[in-house]
From Swiss-Prot:
Binding site for Mg(2+) 1: D275, E288
Main subcellular location: cytoplasm
Organism the protein comes from: Parabacteroides distasonis (strain ATCC 8503 / DSM 20701 / CIP 104284 / JCM 5825 / NCTC 11152)
Cofactor details (free text): Binds 2 magnesium or manganese ions per subunit.
Protein name in the entry: D-alanine--D-alanine ligase
Binding positions (Mg(2+) 2): E288, N290
Function: Cell wall formation.
Catalytic activity: 2 D-alanine + ATP = D-alanyl-D-alanine + ADP + phosphate + H(+)
Family to which this protein belongs: Belongs to the D-alanine--D-alanine ligase family.
Major enzyme class: ligase
Keywords per UniProt: ATP-binding, Cell shape, Cell wall biogenesis/degradation, Cytoplasm, Ligase, Magnesium, Manganese, Metal-binding, Nucleotide-binding, Peptidoglycan synthesis
Keyword Nucleotide-binding: yes
Domain ATP-grasp: 121-321
Length: 330
C-alpha cells in the first residue's frame, strides 16, 4: 500500500510565497508511483490539506489527520518546506516529534539553532569554521554609527537574524544608511545582525546523508547582477547560477568536506545547503546554513542533483525511506 506524504508548506513569515513554490516543486519531484501526495498548509490561522478538487479540508491537530470524502486519512511522513517560522525554527519539528510523525528535516534543536544565524555561526566557530565578524542586536538595543564602523568597517550587511530569502537585508556602503538598514531588518524580526562585507566568490553546497550513503553535491557559483544576492536576484532571474562552480578542484573538495563536517557537527538530517564566500585569500567563510532549502524547479539543490548525474526522484525517496526505516527502529 502506498504511503501518504504531506508536503507541508505555508508559514507565517514573508517567505510564504517561496514556500508554496517549493511545495509545487517537491510535489513534482516525489515518486507518485510509490506515494500518495498531498499539500498541507500550516499557518497561524489555517491548518488544512488541499484536496485534488482544490478544496481546503481542516487538519486535526491531535494527529495531523484529515477527512477526504468522509474518510479519515492519516499521513505516514511529512516533507517540511516551510521557509521561516514555524517550519524552519524547530516549532513544527517539535510538534511532529510529539505525535510521532516522521519528517524530512533536521530535528527541533538543530532547526532552532540553524535558524538563529548568529548563534549557529558562533557555535560552529568553536569547531574551526571560519565566519565573518558581526554584531548582534535585540529589538530595543541601539548602536552608534561610529561603533559599527570601528568594529566592522564599511561596507556591511544588515539583516534579520532569523529570516531568509533576503527579506529585510541591506548592503550598507555609507554611514548615513546604517540606522535605516537596522530599522528595515527589525521590520522582519526581533533580532538583527550587522556583518562585515567580504568581497569574493559566493558558492553554495548541498548535502544529505542516509544509512550507508553520503551525498555531497557539486557546488553552485552565484553571480548576481544586483548589488548582492537579494530577493529580486534569487527569484526574478537577476543572477547567474553556475553549477559546477568555476573554482579549482582542490577548493571544491575542501568546501565539500567542510559541508559534510558541518552536517555531522550539527547532527543534521535530510537535505541541507551551506552557503560560503571565498575571499581573495581562498579560505572559505561560512555565510549560513539552510535546513529547509528552496526546492523550486530552478533552486540550487535540483540544479546540483542534475550536475551530479542523479535523479531528484531518487533523492526524495532516499530521504523518505531512510526516515521511515529509522523511526521504526526507535
Amino acid at each position: 500500500m502506498k504511503k501518504n506524504i504531506a508536503i507541508v508548506a505555508g508559514g507565517d513569515s514573508s517567505e510564504i510565497v517561496i514556500s508554496l513554490k517549493s511545495a509545487d516543486g517537491i510535489y513534482s519531484f516525489i515518486d507518485k508511483d510509490k506515494y500518495n501526495l498531498y499539500i498541507a498548509i500550516v499557518k497561524r490561522d489555517e491548518w488544512a490539506v488541499i484536496l485534488p478538487s482544490g478544496e481546503h479540508t481542516p487538519i486535526d491537530k491531535n494527529d495531523f489527520s484529515f477527512k477526504e470524502n468522509g474518510v479519515t486519512r492519516h499521513f505516514d511522513f511529512a516533507y517540511i518546506t516551510i521557509h521561516g517560522t514555524p517550519g524552519e525554527d524547530g516549532r513544527l519539528q517539535g510538534y511532529f516529534d510529539m505525535i510521532g510523525m516522521p519528517y524530512s528535516s533536521c530535528g527541533m534543536l538543530v532547526s532552532a539553532l540553524t535558524f538563529n544565524k548568529y548563534v549557529c555561526n558562533h557555535y560552529l566557530k568553536d569547531f574551526g569554521v571560519k565566519i565573518a565578524a558581526s554584531i548582534h542586536l535585540f529589538k530595543g538595543e541601539t548602536i552608534t554609527d561610529e561603533e559599527v564602523v570601528t568594529r566592522l568597517g564599511l561596507p556591511i550587511f544588515v539583516k534579520p537574524n532569523d529570516g531568509g530569502s533576503s527579506f529585510g537585508v541591506t548592503k550598507v556602503k555609507e554611514v548615513s544608511a546604517i540606522q535605516p538598514a537596522i530599522a528595515k531588518a527589525f521590520g522582519e524580526g526581533r533580532e538583527v545582525i550587522l556583518e562585515r562585507f567580504i568581497d569574493g566568490t559566493e558558492v553554495t553546497c548541498g548535502c544529505y546523508k542516509v544509512e550507508g550513503k553520503e551525498v555531497v553535491f557539486p557546488l553552485t557559483e552565484v553571480v548576481t547582477n544586483n548589488e548582492f544576492f537579494d530577493f529580486d536576484a534569487k527569484y526574478n532571474g537577476q543572477v547567474d547560477e553556475i553549477t559546477p562552480a568555476r573554482i579549482s578542484t582542490e577548493l571544491t573538495e575542501l568546501i565539500q568536506c567542510e559541508t559534510s563536517r558541518i552536517y555531522d557537527i550539527l547532527g543534521a538530517k535530510g537535505l541541507i545547503r551551506v552557503d560560503y564566500i571565498i575571499p581573495a585569500d581562498g579560505e572559505p567563510v561560512l555565510l549560513e546554513i539552510n535546513t529547509t532549502p528552496g526546492m523550486t524547479a530552478t533552486s540550487f539543490i535540483p540544479q546540483q542533483v542534475r550536475a551530479a548525474g542523479l535523479d531528484i526522484k531518487d533523492v526524495m525517496t532516499d530521504i523518505i525511506e531512510d526516515e521511515l526505516k529509522n523511526r521504526k527502529t526507535k
